[in-house]
C-alpha cells in the first residue's frame, strides 16, 4: 500500500487498509515490549554529564585518566549506640559484625572498606564517641554502585532491626538508590491516578465506554513504543533514568489529547450523516492536521533543550520528542484504522445518564454555554484583555523572588534511609566524607611551589567553617595532584554552592597565585554548580530558538503574522503565571500544606527552562485547535465575530476535557514524594489549566474581536510563503442523515 506523505492521505490510506495498519502497530508494540525487557535498564543512568567541558568535568576527567580511574561511589555506614562508646567491647562486636558482613559481599560489590579498629579512630569516631563510621568505596562506576548498593542496604536494614543501637547508610549510591526507588514509585502512582481520572473525564466528555478507552489505548501504545525506542537508542547514548517519568507523563497527556480531538471530529461527522470513510477523511483533514501541526510545535519547543550541553536535558528532550512523535503517528495512522474498523461501534456501551446531561446541556449549539461566553466576552473585549492580562502579570510577580538550586538530601522524605544517614553523618561528623570538594592540580604536583600552594590553600580553607579535613595525594609520576576537602553541609544546597564559588574565585587564586599549574575544582557540589551555570548561560538561546521557530511555523500554518505573535504572548503569560505560582507555593509555602507539597528554599534549577520548553509546546495545542476551527469558519463566512463564537462553542467541551485530562495526569505526578516531581507536576498542571480556561475563553476571543480582520494579516511581501493551511478539506457539505454502521466508503 502506497501512502502519500500528506497527513490527510496517510490517514485515508490507513483507513482503507485497516488490518495491515493494526498489524504493523501490533508488531511494533510486541517488539518494543521485548526491547524494554531486554535493554531498557542498561540504557538508563543515574548520573548526569556535560557535553562541553566546564571546570568540574575537566577536573574529573584528569582524575579518571591519570589518578584513580572511573569515579567511584563513596558511602558511609554509621553505627550509633545511645549508651556505649566505641571502646566498649559490645560496641566493637556489633561494629565488626556489620563490617565483616559488608566485606563478605566481595570485590564485585565492595572495592574497599575501612575498619576503625585497624586504621585508628581519627575521623571515624564522633566527638562523644558514641557513633562510629565505616567508610566504603563501592566497586565499579556510579551506575554499578547504585545497583549494587541494594545489597549493602539489605544488611543495614537487617541490622537496624536489632535493639540497642542504630545503623545508617548514606552516600552517592545510597542517595541514588533511594531517588530511583522513589521515582519509580511516584511514576506508578502518577500513571495510576492520572490514568483513572483521565478515564472518568473521557467518559464524561465522550459518553461511551468504547470511545473513552480508545484514547487511553493509543496513549499506552505511544508510551510503550517510545520506551522501546529509548531502550534501543540507549545502547549508544545513555538516558537519565528520569526519562521514563517524562515519557509516561507526556505520553498520557498528549496521547490522550490528540486521539480525543480526532475521534471527536470523526463522531461529529458521523452525526452529520457522512459515511465512515468520509468521516475519517474529514476528521483527518481537519483535526488530524491540527494534531500534526500542534505536535510539531511541541517538538520544536522540546528541541530547544537539545541545545544545552547537558545529558539530562538531552535525555528529557529526546524522550518527550519520541513519545510525542509516536502519539502524532498513531493519531494519523492507527486511529483512522481503528475508526474504520469500529465505525459506529465506537459509540457502544453508552452511559445513559451522561448522554442525558449532554443532550440537556448541549453547550456546543448556537445559544449554548460557550456561545454565551463568546458573546459576552466580545461585547467588552478591552475589559477582557486588560483584566486577564493583569491577573496573569500579578501571578507572575512572585517569580522575581525565585531562588534556583537543587532540593538536596534534606528534602527527601524522613523515611529514606539515605536521608537519615546523612543527617546523622552531618550531626556526628563533618558530613563531607561522602561528597568532598576536590581540587585537582594539573602540573608538577610534587614540586615545592605546588606543595607550598597546597599548604597555603589548606590554611585558607581552615578559616572557612564549611570546609573540614583535607587530604592530599598525587599520581605515581607526580603530574596530577588531588586535594580532597570534606564539606560540612548538604552538597546540594545553596550554602555548598556558595562555598565552591569562594573556593574557585577567591581561595584558589590566593593560594596558587603565580604557581605554573592548572587548578580545577570538581566533586558533587562543583558539578551541581556547573549545571546551574550552564543552564543559566544557555537559557536565552533556548528561548530565542523556541520562540523564533514557533513563530515561523504558526505564520506558515495560519498565513498571518498577528496570530503567531498573539499566541506567543499568551503562552508567555501562562508560563510566567506558572513560574510565579510555583515560587508562591513551593518556595514561599502558600497553600503547600493544603496541596500536600513540601516547602523548600529553592526551585529546581532546571525547572524553569524545562517548563518553558514543555509548556510552550503544550499551550500551543489549544491555540492551534481553537484557531484552526475559527479559521475554518472564517474562510467560509468571512465574519470574524461569528467565526470566533463558532470556534469557541465547537471546541469548548473538547478542549476543557482535554485540559482536565492533562491536569489530572500532571496532578498525579505532583502527588509524589520527590520535590522535583511536585514542582514539575504542579507547574505543568496549573499552566495548562490557566491556558485552557481564562486565556482560551476570555483572552483569545477578546483579542480576536479587537483586531477583527487584522488577525489574519500577512504583509504582501510575504505572500510568496507556501500555503500549508491547517484547515484542510471538509469534503463538501454532509448529507442530512447518517449512512450505515461500520462500513461506509
Each model region followed by its residue ranges:
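Membrane-embedded transmembrane helical bundles of large multi-pass transporters/channels
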Residues: 1-43, 48, 108, 127, ...
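A short acidic-to-branched-hydrophobic micro-motif
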Residues: 75-79
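Structured non-transmembrane domains adjacent to transmembrane bundles in polytopic membrane proteins
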Residues: 53-72, 82-173, 401-592, 624, ...
Amino acid at each position: 500500500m502506497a501512502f502519500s506523505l500528506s497527513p490527510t492521505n496517510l490517514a485515508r490510506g490507513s483507513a482503507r487498509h485497516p488490518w495491515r495498519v493494526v498489524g504493523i502497530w501490533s508488531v511494533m508494540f510486541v517488539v518494543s515490549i521485548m526491547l524494554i525487557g531486554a535493554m531498557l535498564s542498561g540504557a538508563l543512568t543515574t548520573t548526569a554529564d556535560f557535553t562541553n567541558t566546564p571546570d568540574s568535568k575537566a577536573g574529573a576527567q584528569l582524575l579518571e585518566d591519570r589518578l584513580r580511574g572511573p569515579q567511584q561511589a563513596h558511602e558511609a555506614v554509621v553505627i550509633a549506640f545511645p549508651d556505649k562508646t566505641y571502646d566498649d567491647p559490645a560496641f566493637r562486636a556489633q561494629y565488626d559484625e556489620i563490617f565483616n558482613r559488608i566485606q563478605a559481599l566481595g570485590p564485585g560489590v565492595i572495592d574497599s572498606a575501612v575498619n576503625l579498629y585497624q586504621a585508628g579512630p581519627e575521623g571515624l569516631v564522633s566527638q562523644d564517641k558514641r557513633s562510629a563510621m565505616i567508610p566504603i568505596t563501592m566497586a565499579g562506576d556510579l551506575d554499578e554502585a547504585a545497583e549494587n548498593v541494594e545489597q549493602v542496604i539489605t544488611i543495614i536494614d537487617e541490622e537496624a532491626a536489632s535493639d540497642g543501637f542504630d545503623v545508617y547508610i548514606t552516600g552517592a549510591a545510597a542517595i541514588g538508590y533511594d531517588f530511583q526507588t522513589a521515582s519509580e514509585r511516584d511514576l506508578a502512582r502518577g500513571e495510576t491516578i492520572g490514568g483513572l481520572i483521565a478515564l472518568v473525564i473521557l467518559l464524561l466528555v465522550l459518553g461511551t465506554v468504547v470511545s473513552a478507552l480508545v484514547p487511553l489505548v493509543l496513549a499506552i501504545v505511544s508510551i510503550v513504543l517510545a520506551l522501546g525506542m529509548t531502550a534501543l537508542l540507549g545502547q549508544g547514548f545513555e538516558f537519565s533514568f528520569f526519562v521514563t517519568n517524562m515519557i509516561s507523563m507526556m505520553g498520557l497527556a498528549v496521547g490522550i489529547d490528540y486521539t480525543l480531538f480526532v475521534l471527536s471530529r470523526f463522531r461529529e461527522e458521523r452525526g452529520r450523516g457522512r459515511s465512515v470513510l468520509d468521516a475519517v477523511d474529514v476528521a483527518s483533514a481537519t483535526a488530524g492536521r491540527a494534531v500534526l501541526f500542534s505536535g510539531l510545535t511541541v517538538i520544536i519547543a522540546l528541541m530547544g533543550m537539545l541545545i544545552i550541553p547537558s545529558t539530562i536535558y538531552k535525555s528529557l528532550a529526546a524522550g518527550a520528542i519520541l513519545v510525542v512523535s509516536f502519539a502524532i503517528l498513531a493519531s494519523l495512522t492507527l486511529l483512522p484504522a481503528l475508526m474504520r474498523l469500529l465505525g459506529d461501534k465506537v459509540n457502544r456501551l453508552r452511559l445513559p445518564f451522561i448522554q442525558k446531561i449532554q443532550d440537556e446541556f448541549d453547550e456546543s449549539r448556537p445559544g449554548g454555554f460557550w456561545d454565551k461566553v463568546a458573546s459576552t466576552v466580545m461585547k467588552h473585549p478591552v475589559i477582557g484583555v486588560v483584566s486577564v492580562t493583569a491577573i496573569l502579570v500579578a501571578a507572575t510577580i512572585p517569580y522575581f523572588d525565585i531562588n534556583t538550586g537543587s532540593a538536596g538530601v534534606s528534602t527527601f522524605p524522613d523515611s529514606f534511609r539515605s536521608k537519615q544517614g546523612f543527617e546523622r553523618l552531618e550531626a556526628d561528623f563533618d558530613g563531607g566524607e561522602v561528597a568532598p570538594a576536590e581540587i585537582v592540580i594539573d602540573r608538577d604536583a610534587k614540586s615545592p611551589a605546588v606543595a607550598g600552594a597546597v599548604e597555603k590553600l589548606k590554611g585558607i580553607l581552615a578559616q572557612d567553617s564549611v570546609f573540614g579535613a583535607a587530604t592530599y595525594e598525587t599520581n605515581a609520576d607526580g603530574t596530577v595532584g588531588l586535594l580532597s576537602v570534606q564539606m560540612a553541609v548538604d552538597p546540594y544546597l545553596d550554602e555548598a554552592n556558595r562555598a565552591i564559588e569562594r573556593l574557585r574565585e577567591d581561595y584558589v587564586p590566593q593560594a596558587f597565585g603565580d604557581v605554573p599549574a592548572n587548578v580545577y575544582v570538581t566533586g558533587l557540589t562543583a558539578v551541581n554548580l556547573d549545571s546551574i551555570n550552564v543552564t543559566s548561560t544557555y537559557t536565552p538561546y533556548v528561548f530565542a530558538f523556541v520562540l523564533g521557530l514557533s513563530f515561523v511555523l504558526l505564520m506558515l500554518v495560519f498565513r498571518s503574522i498577528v496570530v503567531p505573535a498573539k499566541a506567543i504572548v499568551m503562552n508567555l503569560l501562562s508560563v510566567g503565571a506558572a513560574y510565579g505560582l510555583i515560587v508562591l507555593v513551593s518556595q514561599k509555602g502558600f497553600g503547600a500544606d493544603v496541596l500536600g507539597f513540601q516547602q523548600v528554599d529553592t526551585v529546581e534549577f532546571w525547572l524553569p527552562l524545562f517548563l518553558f520548553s514543555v509548556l510552550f509546546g503544550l499551550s500551543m495545542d489549544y491555540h492551534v485547535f481553537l484557531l484552526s476551527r475559527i479559521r475554518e469558519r472564517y474562510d467560509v463566512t468571512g465574519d470574524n465575530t461569528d467565526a470566533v463564537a463558532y470556534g469557541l462553542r465547537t471546541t469548548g467541551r473538547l478542549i476543557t476535557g482535554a485540559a482536565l485530562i492533562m491536569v489530572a495526569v500532571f496532578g498525579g505526578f505532583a502527588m509524589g514524594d520527590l520535590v522535583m516531581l511536585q514542582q514539575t507536576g504542579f507547574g505543568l498542571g496549573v499552566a495548562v489549566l490557566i491556558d485552557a480556561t481564562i486565556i482560551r475563553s476570555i483572552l483569545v476571543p477578546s483579542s480576536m474581536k479587537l483586531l477583527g480582520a487584522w488577525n489574519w494579516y500577512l504583509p504582501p511581501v510575504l505572500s510568496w510563503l507556501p500555503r500549508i493551511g491547517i484547515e484542510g478539506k471538509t469534503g463538501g457539505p454532509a448529507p442530512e442523515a447518517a449512512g450505515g454502521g461500520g462500513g461506509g466508503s
